[in-house]
Every structure is written in C-alpha cells, then in structure tokens.
Amino acid sequence: MSQLTHINAAGEAHMVDVSTKQESVREARAQAFVVMLPQTLQMIIDGSHHKGDVFATARIAGIQAAKRTWELIPLCHPLLLSKVEVTLVAEPAHHRVRIESLCRLSGKTGVEMEALTAASVAALTIYDMCKAVQKDIVIEQCRLLSKSGGKSGDFQAVAND
C-alpha cells in the first residue's frame, strides 16, 4: 500500500511539493446521486420549482466548486483547470438525480478532489433548493469514477448501480 503523501516524516500534515513533477494531461470523473420523493423529482423535471431551474443552478454551483476546491480542502493545490463539466440526469425509475462531473488539466497534480467537490456541491445545491418541499432528501454514492494521468496511473471504479 502507498504511503500517505500529505504526512511528513514527523507525522505532520503538509502540502506536497509538486515542483519537480512532469506535467501531464490529467482527468477525473466523479458521481453523486440525490434521492428524493417522486413528486419532488417531477417538480424539478417540470421546471415548476419556485426558486427556478434546479439543474442549471446545481451545474453552475458544481463548476464553481471545482474551481475553488483549493480554498475548501486544506493542502489542495490551486489548479488551472482546462475543463469542468457537470452533467445532471433525472432518473425517475429510481426517484433520483444522477450527477457526474469531469475535470481536466495539463499539470503536475491530479484533479480527483476537484471532480469530487463538483459532484458534491452540485448535490448539496439540489438539496438546498428542494429542502423546503422535502427535508429527507438523501445524497449518496459520492465517489470517484475514474482518473487518468500522473505517475500513479489510471483508475476505473467498479460499476455498482
């Protein structure tokens, strides 16, 4: 098993020095699901929510969150992202919204945290916009789907839904 990269020899948290790493194209995809009552989901699909377009707001929130991950999570590097995409799909058969994010850059460190932050904040935004009509909405399965680039190699999650 690999060592924790954010812990130094003295056991203290520190920001990893990436200055000697080679730049490469790095990409990560993450997902989250927001599970709700059928009528809450239908309100989103119909566009009848009094706060406006839930998907558009969640998409923008996710993109903005990816760009600000370094401000939210200690020890993350500020990154010059070249692409952030947040896709939201209503899945009425499962009473949920599937959120998938994609982050890409050419740089010295990965974008997994940015992809996870984008999916998480998009999910939180859906909850925030819908909590007035349903308080027991569930955010679940927030996870990394894949990553590519960098010396640690590629990763692909096992499908579970």
Swiss-Prot record:
Under the heading SUPFAM superfamilies, the entry gives:
Molybdenum cofactor biosynthesis protein C, MoaC (SSF55040)
- Which parts of the sequence bind substrate? L75, C76, H77, M113, E114
Gene Ontology terms describing biological process = Mo-molybdopterin cofactor biosynthetic process
Which InterPro entries does the record match to this protein?
A: MoaC, MoaC_bact/euk, MoaC_sf, MoCo_biosynth_MoaA/MoaC, Mopterin_CF_biosynth-C_dom
Q: What is its EC number?
A: 4.6.1.17
Q: In which pathway does it act?
A: Cofactor biosynthesis; molybdopterin biosynthesis
Q: Pfam family of this protein, just one?
A: MoaC
**Which UniProt keywords are given for this protein, alphabetically ordered?**
Lyase, Molybdenum cofactor biosynthesis
Q: Which residues form the active site?
A: D128
Please state what class of enzyme this protein is: lyase
According to its UniProt record, which protein family does this protein belong to? Belongs to the MoaC family.
The protein depicted here goes by the name Cyclic pyranopterin monophosphate synthase
Source organism of the structure: Erwinia tasmaniensis (strain DSM 17950 / CFBP 7177 / CIP 109463 / NCPPB 4357 / Et1/99)
Species lineage, top-down? Answer: Bacteria, Pseudomonadati, Pseudomonadota, Gammaproteobacteria, Enterobacterales
